Amino acid sequence: MNYSLFISCSKGLEYLLEDELKGLGLHVTQVSPQGVYGEASLPVIYNLCLWSRLANRIQLILFSGHAAKEQAVHQLCTDFHWQTVFTHDKTIAIEFHGASEQIRNTMFGAQIVKDGIVDHFRRLNGSRPSVDKEKPQILIHAHLKNDILTVSFDLVGYSLHQRGYRKKAGKAPLKENVAAAMLLRAKWPELAAQGYGLHDPFCGSGTLVIEAAMMAAHIAPGLLRQDQSLQYWARHQSSLWEKLRTQALQQVKPLAVKLVGTDADGKIITLARSNAERAGVLPLVEFNTLPLNACRPGTKKGLVVCNPPYGERLGEVTQLVPLYQQLGTTLHTCYQGWQAAILTSSPVLAKALGLRADKQYTLYNGPLECKLYCLTLSAANKLKNTPNAPLSDNAQMLFNRLEKNRNHLQKWARKNQITCYRIYDADLPEYAYAIDIYNDYAVLQEYAPPASIPVHKAEKRSLEMLQVVPRALGIHPEKLIVKQRKQQKGSEQYQKIGKTSQRLIVTEGKAKLIVNLYDYLDTGLFLDHRLMRLKFAQLEPGTRFLNCFCYTASASVHAALAGALTTNVDLSKTYLLWAEDNFRLNDIDLSKHQFLQYDCKEWMKITRDKFDVIFLDPPSFSNSKRMSDILDIQRDHVSLINMAMRLLNPNGVLYFSTNLRQFKLEPMLKEKYAVQDITPQTIDQDFKRNSKIHHCFKIVMPHFADN
């Protein structure tokens, strides 16, 4: 008797899975992006459960039928002969996927299927199975699409990637079946048969090395667990199952060479050894604590296979370029005659290897699309893109410009007690970056390239930028941070891109300020407003200073150091806490200053306080959910300025600033107030190349201007 099956897999593995399943005896009827459909006898089903290295779940298709409505789903599930699958004393759980016009909630769909099963057994013998959502003996899958319900029984009960040997993993674990796919794409079974060695220099918890050992030693991955759901299946033949398990055990063979995993993290190596012991391959493998640059081959020929870090947070990719360059250098220098297979999601990092790939395969590490680069390490595969490689003509022009800017701006910065400044701002259009110096760090903000620029050209420019900046500016490669600067919209204002809590203290005149170069697109300090901040550093003691949309209140720090009494208003609690930290860093008594978490527009409407100096620097646009209304600075600047002017003492001054490049001040404001465009006076030396970085206006009441 043959059974209809659906075997699911990770995205991108369906055709590799098809080949594997055919080799195990499945008659394939259809391949889809979600997996493979086929027919198989009971012995073949058991072998699939024991031997598949790529599958996620093996589902026995029970029935399908038209079911647009709740009643139809219930009827199909009530009518099916469930006693042919399991008995009433088993525990069950339902996983429901899909929807119809009437069934839009998967929990509701699962409830209908469960009710149908329960009603069937009650009619049959008056008893019913119990529900156990955590660890059911019988897991039923129901899928509703285009008003067709398909119901299946999960023969194993869990995803087959859960081999049972990995109790703990590192920070970025690789699924066992994705690791197996990497090895199959790299032709590891064939290489192992020829006596090749294997080395994973980023082994983490050992998944790749363990999977490679199981393949080479012909160990069936399904042997490691004995809690498969098929033992509760009504048609299970335990004698046949045990016979096939015994045959699988008899096929295990010894290895001629040990497979090696190394990692710079000693703690993770201990975990890898424990995992290998649980997998039963500890005698076949060797795990050592070793940095990448110390890795050396133990055999003349072999396969280097690895899943290095590839940084999905903004800024991390660039941090990893030196690591990939070192990997390329180590492979080229020490592993001649070997093969290599390297998984990464970043084309920039792949190019940083400096080695030519023979083949590329798309794989998915979870939801993340990656490429597996397969290489032959030979003299013919010459190393490129090394840190000291000769510069192209364009890259040399960039080097010259950066060196010129550095020589000019470093002297100016030292003279003015400034440790953070802009050194480059797309001076050469083909290298569309802004580069800011923060102490001995460089933050590279890449302007999003136009769609007309081919991807390969943009990637080439990125690599050249990373090659040139450390040389020209004397910055260590590990202290380069890259972000992509694009037009910010709505909730993207001050976009958070990660969490490292890595803070750096910089100096600006008499003030010390905290910046975070990693976790946000912006660093906590708008460098272009430096001259405005230094202007506030000259306020008279006792001046009442309002900083609206205060961000991290760096302007207020300067004012407070001069003796001003500051009020700081912002909607973000995160930035207000950061502002308080800035004050503490400068030994400023917080009791003399206010930090108010408010929508600035609403606060200015209700406050009765008066101020001598107001700094109003709103975002160009914001639609934060916590705001009462959308903020559009071109549309709303008149009302904001009017509200701020109401809060001024008779002789007070409002400084209004915006970074909206195309900003136009409403002419009627000049009729109502004395308005002076002071933008040129607020552009410091490092922003002279980009005089439209912001607009700044000094606004006072007309009678005060006459005085």
UniProtKB/Swiss-Prot annotation:
Catalytic activity of the protein: guanosine(2445) in 23S rRNA + S-adenosyl-L-methionine = N(2)-methylguanosine(2445) in 23S rRNA + S-adenosyl-L-homocysteine + H(+); guanosine(2069) in 23S rRNA + S-adenosyl-L-methionine = N(2)-methylguanosine(2069) in 23S rRNA + S-adenosyl-L-homocysteine + H(+)
Keyword rRNA processing in annotation: yes
Pfam family, one: Methyltrans_SAM
Superkingdom classification of source: Bacteria
PROSITE patterns in the cross-refs: THUMP, UPF0020
MF term (GO), any: RNA binding
Protein EC: 2.1.1.173, 2.1.1.264
Residues forming coiled coils: none
Residue intervals of the THUMP domain: 44-155
GO CC terms of this entry: cytoplasm
InterPro entries: 23SrRNA_methyltr_KL, DNA_methylase_N6_adenine_CS, RlmKL-like_Mtase, RlmKL-like_Mtase_CS, RlmL_1st, SAM-dep_methyl-trfase, SAM-dependent_MTases_sf, THUMP_dom
Subcellular location: Cytoplasm
UniProt name for this protein: Ribosomal RNA large subunit methyltransferase K/L
Disulfide bonds: none
Keywords linked to the UniProt accession: Cytoplasm, Methyltransferase, RNA-binding, rRNA processing, S-adenosyl-L-methionine, Transferase
Provenance organism: Legionella pneumophila (strain Corby)
Function noted in UniProt: Specifically methylates the guanine in position 2445 (m2G2445) and the guanine in position 2069 (m7G2069) of 23S rRNA.
Membership in a protein family: Belongs to the methyltransferase superfamily. RlmKL family.
